[in-house]
UniProtKB/Swiss-Prot annotation:
Source organism phylogeny: Bacteria, Pseudomonadati, Campylobacterota, Epsilonproteobacteria, Campylobacterales
Gene responsible for this protein: folK
Gene source species: Helicobacter pylori (strain J99 / ATCC 700824) (Campylobacter pylori J99)
Gene Ontology BP, a term: folic acid biosynthetic process
EC number: 2.7.6.3
Keywords associated with the record: ATP-binding, Folate biosynthesis, Kinase, Nucleotide-binding, Transferase
Protein name: 2-amino-4-hydroxy-6-hydroxymethyldihydropteridine pyrophosphokinase
Family named by the database record: Belongs to the HPPK family.
Domain of life: Bacteria
GO molecular-function terms, A-Z: 2-amino-4-hydroxy-6-hydroxymethyldihydropteridine diphosphokinase activity; ATP binding; kinase activity
Amino acid sequence: MMREILTNRFFPSLFKKRLDFSNRVVLGLGSNLKNPLKILKSCFLYFKNHSKIGKIFSSPIYINPPFGYTNQPNFYNATIILKTSLGLRHFFALVFYIERRFGRARKRDFKDAPRTLDIDIIAFNQVILRQNDLTLPHPKWSERDSVLVPLTLQQILFKREEW
């Protein structure tokens, strides 16, 4: 059961644009198909270069075994905290688009199936929401090492006033 922390030029990283948007979002990223490191880097760059995203900072990458269905490659996970001018529904649509852009099929073969890219919205400001397609904060974030480890490392590496 391998667990490992990876760092590179983009993970962890703090990037600030001159614009400072008001909506604060916490994301969990995961990938275990094709080239997970390349996919996570490309996802980070997509958010970084988006005109509606201001500050963005990422955790180190946490490599960990899958849960649920375990006969699959290890997951590469990271967290990203960003500021955006997009409202919740527009941001949710952007996440949906990015997942598809990176090859994620909307229909999974089965629960906990391998995937090229999974983006979970862990939190959006202080919104509490329970709908069929979205629950905030993410209902299982506090039970998953794939979120807790990167998020904890992120908090250690960056002072709150930096973001």
